[in-house]
């Protein structure tokens, strides 16, 4: 597979969250995206009033379907960046230890250290580096090579500043991280998460 379908279920807008997540996954969706700054809840809100969020995590954990969380600030209208901090995902990783968790944008720009910490702390947490210009990657994730087996490539294309995925790959390779690190980040890690 070269293109994998990704979907989302917003527990604030669904009456039967468990039924909806099952329906979406039964369609062949391979990953669920949760976008806290735009969906307006913390990733661990299931520990309070938004218990339905746990239904999404539980179903994905049972099926081995990764959940990607937007981490890092958003400049788009109506975003609430208080929900952009990845630290609440610490609870998710503990409460759902078999759930593959992907931290989109590696917390950029304000929460990179937190995202890196979570990926190092938890076996089931991975960093995804889309939205970070490759030439600036080492500024945002200076020890990316230390975590190479848990970092996923991404471009966030099409978006401002991303002229093409090919150019992003070329800029990434120009960092000189070494062939093995590049292979893990560009291919191996995603192949393992999405068999």
Name what the model sees in each region:
Residues 109, 130-140, 182-195:
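C-terminal helical cap
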Residues 11-15, 39-41, 73-77, 107-114, ...:
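Active-site environment of divalent metal-dependent phosphoester hydrolases
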Residues 26-31, 62-66, 95-99, 119-126, ...:
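Glycine-enriched alpha-helix->loop->beta-strand junction motifs that scaffold or abut catalytic
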Residues 1-75, 121:
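Active-site gating/metal-coordination segments in enzymes
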Residues 24, 32, 60, 105, ...:
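Conserved, mostly hydrophobic/aromatic
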Residues 22-23, 27, 146-150, 163-195:
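Mid-to-C-terminal alpha-helical segments outside catalytic/metal-binding sites
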């Amino acid at each position: 597979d070269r293109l994998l379908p990704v979907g989302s279920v917003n527990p604030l807008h669904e009456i039967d969250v468990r039924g909806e997540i099952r329906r979406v996954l039964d369609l062949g969706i391979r990953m669920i995206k949760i976008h806290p700054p735009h969906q307006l809840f913390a990733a661990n809100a299931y520990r309070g009033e938004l218990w339905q969020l746990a239904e999404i995590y539980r179903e994905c954990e049972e099926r081995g379907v990764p959940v990607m969380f937007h981490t890092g600030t958003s400049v788009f209208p109506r975003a609430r960046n208080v929900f952009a901090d990845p630290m609440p995902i610490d609870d998710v990783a503990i409460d759902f230890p078999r759930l593959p968790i992907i931290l989109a944008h590696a917390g950029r720009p304000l929460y990179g250290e937190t995202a890196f910490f979570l990926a190092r702390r938890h076996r089931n947490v991975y960093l995804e580096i889309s939205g970070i210009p490759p030439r600036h990657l080492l500024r945002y994730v200076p020890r990316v090579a230390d975590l190479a087996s848990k970092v996923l490539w991404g471009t966030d294309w099409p978006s401002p500043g991303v002229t093409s995925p090919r150019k992003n790959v070329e800029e990434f390779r120009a960092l000189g991280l070494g062939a093995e690190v590049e292979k893990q980040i560009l291919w191996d890690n995603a192949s393992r998460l999405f068999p």
